[in-house]
Amino acid sequence: MSFSRSAADPADTLPDLAATLAAPGDDAFVALGDAFHTRLPAAPLPAPYVVGFSAEVAQLLGLPPSLAAHAQFAELFAGNPTRDWPAHALPYASVYSGHQFGVWAGQLGDGRALTIGELPGSDGRRYELQLKGGGRTPYSRMGDGRAVLRSSIREYLCSEAMHHLGIPTTRALTVIGSDQPVVREEIETSAVVTRVSESFVRFGHFEHFFSNDRPDLLRRLADHVIERFYPACREADDPYLALLEAAMLRTADMVAQWQAVGFCHGVMNTDNMSILGVTIDYGPFGFVDAFDANHICNHSDTSGRYAYRMQPRIAHWNCYCLAQALLPLIGLQHGIGDDDARAERAVDDAQAVLAKFPERFGPALERAMRAKLGLELEREHDAELANQLLETMHASHADFTLTFRRLAQLSKHDASRDAPVRDLFIDRAAFDAWANLYRARLSEETRDDAARAAAMNRVNPKYVLRNHLAEVAIRRAKDKDFSEVERLAQILRRPFDEQPEHEPYAALPPDWAGSLEVSCSS
């Protein structure tokens, strides 16, 4: 059954959409079998209303932008029944395990997320739609299965902001709110965010079947991921080793992009790592304001495990966990000697792959930093120059986003134009010393100041989702004013443009922003 993208009347569209969601392809995750998921209806969300809607994501899914005006739109994406769902087509929650804060946590799973199906995208790919906050599942443990308005708005906005920064990420179609109260650190109201991704398979899915000694199911999962998302691995000498390497390289690239924009994920547990190398699970994230290499965005992270500077190391560690989970599959097709010999060879092969992480991450970050500095030519000491800037920023707590954006205004020959960026530094002499090194390096470039500035402004965003901007939108949304959610979403879709009418959104955070805290409570 197919969804008609040309339907002119939203009233005709919604039933077709529900039917299409209920009819996944034969190679969908849900087709792997009951050992991978549990089907169950979402918990009804009373009196739902639309808080935010991305027409851009709707178009990606082949849906008309007018869809949000449908009377039953909020009902469907709140998880409320809009039709009689047969048992074989109910939403499902998947099971996985994982390491949380470096400690084996055992079985986890979608404790409040329900996948309602998949839709064909306008780009030729297929996308799963998942309701985060859809109610309790068999994997909820002590949770209530709900998400709150605060965290749902943050995830909705950041998913789209990251996409427009060019960073691999899940997307967000809509946020649906309700006045239903839920208890967190205080009483809040419920919401559901519809997440969109080609797949929600995590490192933790592989860890689950490894830890339960189910190599048959582990192989079924790996074959699914290879067939659908990494087809080139099929032709490799060892497809499962190739899968490890492909996922690891994507992860390294993703984290390099995080570092380049000052993004902190906040909770890089293995169950929050996508096998596709996309950013997933926006919880206690944050963009660094006053730069601190040791910045911790999650106040639940008392040890600083997931601090900004630690993210590359943790990503690498997580890849080790993925490698361990894949060991029973690596080398299977070679049939090398007995099981002990094969296992020993698998460990050696996996170690060789894992050694490539820094080889991938380092150059990826260097390329990003070279672009941020407007350096077109490659020179031996460029990485050192970038690191010296970061150290100078760290010492002065200079704003990360504004420093790189304003650096474009610096002239090769005229230090009098340094003021906009220089004023961000407490230690002006330290900045001047670095700026002299930078000018010397710029003298080797062929581009003039204007061309360099234009190039820098294409990679250094002016607008990012700072915590205080999200907080203002959340506070207004609690009063049923969703205009700031929409305004902020529109601004963040053009992060590199000047947008002079929105200049306050690019300013330094106000003093009150320093008291904001985000945690795993969502």
Curated annotation (Swiss-Prot):
Residues forming the catalytic site: 271 (proton acceptor)
InterPro entries: SelO
Residues that coordinate or bind Mg(2+): 272, 281
Keywords (A to Z) from UniProt: ATP-binding, Magnesium, Manganese, Metal-binding, Nucleotide-binding, Nucleotidyltransferase, Transferase
Binding locations of ATP: 109, 111-112, 132, 144-145, 195, 202, 281
Functional summary from the UniProt entry: Nucleotidyltransferase involved in the post-translational modification of proteins. It can catalyze the addition of adenosine monophosphate (AMP) or uridine monophosphate (UMP) to a protein, resulting in modifications known as AMPylation and UMPylation.
Annotated family: Belongs to the SELO family.
Record protein name field: Protein nucleotidyltransferase YdiU
Organism in which the protein naturally occurs: Burkholderia vietnamiensis (strain G4 / LMG 22486)
Upper taxonomic lineage: Bacteria, Pseudomonadati, Pseudomonadota, Betaproteobacteria, Burkholderiales
